[in-house]
């Protein structure tokens, strides 16, 4: 009897002639003996080619017994459907398999190129992630970041002036004498002596004055090039600030008692009052304009605009300070902590005046803080919206008599701007008191209108304000 194992094999293979009479010796005891088997004229096993034609199953690859060959992504998963385990056998790495399986199982979510503006796409299971270039944001990198910039936030990223626009992104602009660079935010000088730059430092490749008035230090020659010295009858009167070749800003109270206006002289490029070094330029003051709201002997609206008889020549030692736009001054410059004040005023309260130009770095205070500090020493100064406080409450440093009318200059991103005018204070460097400055931003439009208008007759003029 043919063994059960052989019969089963024959049935599974469906072979014809598998059990031919002469093919297998049959043992009398019901069991086969290898030693008694003798080959007959018929075969039990067929050739590989015949078997390949007999075995019928769902085709998964290009050849028989493909599992014995190295895995191929093209053969296993592109021509036929493969399982996760089969893909893992091909990649030999779980993470690589997962990355492949995301796209293989639900399609490539990046196929439609959803990421805009140069963003790169990473496929996820039924989703995708866009990696945006630095200037863009959003799910599909569809939003230009600058669209979210507003001028009140870091000046909109602008180096100088910023303008907000409804429905569109903010735009940057530059002061006269500068032009906007291709990046849309930076400004570059277009003239030899633009306002707010210090040529002496530019040529030395430095950025800020070395000098740090009462408690101050000497401003190195050429590092305060907009400083003006006002003389009347040859005597020191006040300070001032050059804002272009023909206009100077000072304090109105400096002119309360002037009688001989023809002897009012403005000196530019001055440094040491005890010597003449050839960099000075003297110009007669042709006209003094004060606000109609200023009352002599008081402190409110303490500002004056002076027109020179002839323009000055801009040099390394004579450069105007930028008169900023009002919005820029109020929302940006007003929050710069420290600014410079300069002048030839008294070095001590009731002391001698300075021979060399002095400069002091002073912190700006909120009006409420200024009032609170003053009340602690029993004082209640009248600080209006046309003024601001700056200085130190410990009595160590301050502007003083003789500095009046001089500049409070604020530095922002490489350029200096006029933000205040030395006006008044309780003594000089008195404990618990601060210097009070005219808030120039309140008068920007007033100043610009006067400078654009035709000259009017007269030396002292009162112009309507506001």
From Swiss-Prot:
<feature type="disulfide bond">
    <location>
        <begin position="132"/>
        <end position="141"/>
    </location>
</feature>
<keyword id="KW-0964">Secreted</keyword>
<dbReference type="InterPro" id="IPR050442">
    <property type="entry name" value="Peptidase_S1_coag_factors"/>
</dbReference>
<dbReference type="InterPro" id="IPR018114">
    <property type="entry name" value="TRYPSIN_HIS"/>
</dbReference>
<comment type="similarity">
    <text>Belongs to the peptidase S1 family.</text>
</comment>
<feature type="disulfide bond">
    <location>
        <begin position="151"/>
        <end position="162"/>
    </location>
</feature>
<feature type="modified residue" description="4-carboxyglutamate">
    <location>
        <position position="74"/>
    </location>
</feature>
<dbReference type="InterPro" id="IPR043504">
    <property type="entry name" value="Peptidase_S1_PA_chymotrypsin"/>
</dbReference>
<feature type="active site" description="Charge relay system">
    <location>
        <position position="404"/>
    </location>
</feature>
<feature type="modified residue" description="(3R)-3-hydroxyaspartate">
    <location>
        <position position="123"/>
    </location>
</feature>
<feature type="glycosylation site" description="N-linked (GlcNAc...) asparagine">
    <location>
        <position position="205"/>
    </location>
</feature>
<keyword id="KW-0378">Hydrolase</keyword>
<dbReference type="GO" id="GO:0005796">
    <property type="term" value="C:Golgi lumen"/>
</dbReference>
<feature type="site" description="Important for S-112 for O-xylosylation">
    <location>
        <position position="113"/>
    </location>
</feature>
<feature type="active site" description="Charge relay system">
    <location>
        <position position="302"/>
    </location>
</feature>
<feature type="modified residue" description="4-carboxyglutamate">
    <location>
        <position position="67"/>
    </location>
</feature>
<feature type="disulfide bond">
    <location>
        <begin position="238"/>
        <end position="254"/>
    </location>
</feature>
<feature type="domain" description="EGF-like 2">
    <location>
        <begin position="147"/>
        <end position="188"/>
    </location>
</feature>
<feature type="disulfide bond">
    <location>
        <begin position="174"/>
        <end position="187"/>
    </location>
</feature>
<keyword id="KW-0165">Cleavage on pair of basic residues</keyword>
<keyword id="KW-0301">Gamma-carboxyglutamic acid</keyword>
<feature type="disulfide bond">
    <location>
        <begin position="370"/>
        <end position="389"/>
    </location>
</feature>
<feature type="glycosylation site" description="N-linked (GlcNAc...) asparagine">
    <location>
        <position position="382"/>
    </location>
</feature>
<feature type="domain" description="EGF-like 1; calcium-binding">
    <location>
        <begin position="106"/>
        <end position="142"/>
    </location>
</feature>
<feature type="modified residue" description="4-carboxyglutamate">
    <location>
        <position position="66"/>
    </location>
</feature>
<feature type="active site" description="Charge relay system">
    <location>
        <position position="253"/>
    </location>
</feature>
<feature type="modified residue" description="4-carboxyglutamate">
    <location>
        <position position="85"/>
    </location>
</feature>
<keyword id="KW-0106">Calcium</keyword>
<feature type="disulfide bond">
    <location>
        <begin position="110"/>
        <end position="121"/>
    </location>
</feature>
<dbReference type="InterPro" id="IPR017857">
    <property type="entry name" value="Coagulation_fac-like_Gla_dom"/>
</dbReference>
<feature type="disulfide bond">
    <location>
        <begin position="77"/>
        <end position="82"/>
    </location>
</feature>
<dbReference type="GO" id="GO:0006508">
    <property type="term" value="P:proteolysis"/>
</dbReference>
<dbReference type="Pfam" id="PF00089">
    <property type="entry name" value="Trypsin"/>
</dbReference>
<keyword id="KW-0379">Hydroxylation</keyword>
<dbReference type="GO" id="GO:0002690">
    <property type="term" value="P:positive regulation of leukocyte chemotaxis"/>
</dbReference>
<feature type="site" description="Cleavage; by factor Xa, factor XIIa, factor IXa, or thrombin">
    <location>
        <begin position="212"/>
        <end position="213"/>
    </location>
</feature>
<feature type="disulfide bond">
    <location>
        <begin position="115"/>
        <end position="130"/>
    </location>
</feature>
<feature type="glycosylation site" description="O-linked (Fuc) serine">
    <location>
        <position position="120"/>
    </location>
</feature>
<keyword id="KW-1015">Disulfide bond</keyword>
<feature type="modified residue" description="4-carboxyglutamate">
    <location>
        <position position="80"/>
    </location>
</feature>
<dbReference type="InterPro" id="IPR001254">
    <property type="entry name" value="Trypsin_dom"/>
</dbReference>
<dbReference type="InterPro" id="IPR001881">
    <property type="entry name" value="EGF-like_Ca-bd_dom"/>
</dbReference>
